[in-house]
């Protein structure tokens, strides 16, 4: 569960696939106020080489993608329902594309004792189109559950897509509402991705600084990925 109950601002930075390249990264900025939220993600694919038909490098370019998001949520009886809208833009040197995708979901507390349930349908709508080629959206149905026990929180999430599914599970430990230790495991059989994750959040005054880490050797593209997040309660 989110550590913030109030309006907040957050910034995340990730160097992506560092086992393969050293200049691919993304930045994520999020602002939540009341029932509304806005966010933006900038993805930098790193410097690429442009070559001619003989393989001779002519120039370099840097493809970029951005996702601009808006969310709205409201409480209906004891449940929370939400809507998510995202504008996707791609600038891939010689090709540009835009898309508009949506997501709807609900949070259902205490469906069985202290078990909370989240259900969401994500990434459906209008896929980005590059010339005459239309990309395919990763539309998914996500079902997640969380269960608290004393200072512990246990969670799991199943993501069902058109051709495959992924699953993640984990636990977190709350130490005096100032330090949270986290550990999890992710499974994607189709893409042969299975790895453990670890995280640590530290709260001071209105700030929460978080760091997460994907463990893996050099055969795992996402291995040794570190995400740093800074949250500010407003």
Model-flagged regions — what are they?
Residues 1-234:
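Subset of outer-membrane beta-barrel
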């Amino acid at each position: 569960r989110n550590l913030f109950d109030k309006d907040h601002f957050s910034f995340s930075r990730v160097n992506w696939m560092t086992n393969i390249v050293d200049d691919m990264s993304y930045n994520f900025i999020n602002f939540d106020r009341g029932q509304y939220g806005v966010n933006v993600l900038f993805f930098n694919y790193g410097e690429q080489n442009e070559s001619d038909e003989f393989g001779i490098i002519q120039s370099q370019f840097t493809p970029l993608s951005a996702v601009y998001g808006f969310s709205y949520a409201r409480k209906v009886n004891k449940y929370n329902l939400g809507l998510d809208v995202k504008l996707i833009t791609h600038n891939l040197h010689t090709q540009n594309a835009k898309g508009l995708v949506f997501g709807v979901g609900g949070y259902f507390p205490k469906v069985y004792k202290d078990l909370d349930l989240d259900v969401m349908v994500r990434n459906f709508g209008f896929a980005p189109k590059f010339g005459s080629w239309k990309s395919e959206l990763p539309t998914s149905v996500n079902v997640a559950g969380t269960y608290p026990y004393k200072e512990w929180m246990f969670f799991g999430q199943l993501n069902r897509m058109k051709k495959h599914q992924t699953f993640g599970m984990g636990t977190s430990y709350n130490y005096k509402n100032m330090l949270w230790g986290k550990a999890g495991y992710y499974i994607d059989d189709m893409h042969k991705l299975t790895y453990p994750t670890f995280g640590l959040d530290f709260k001071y005054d209105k700030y929460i600084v978080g760091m997460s880490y994907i463990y893996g050797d050099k055969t795992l593209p996402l291995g040794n990925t570190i995400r740093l997040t800074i949250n500010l309660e407003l």
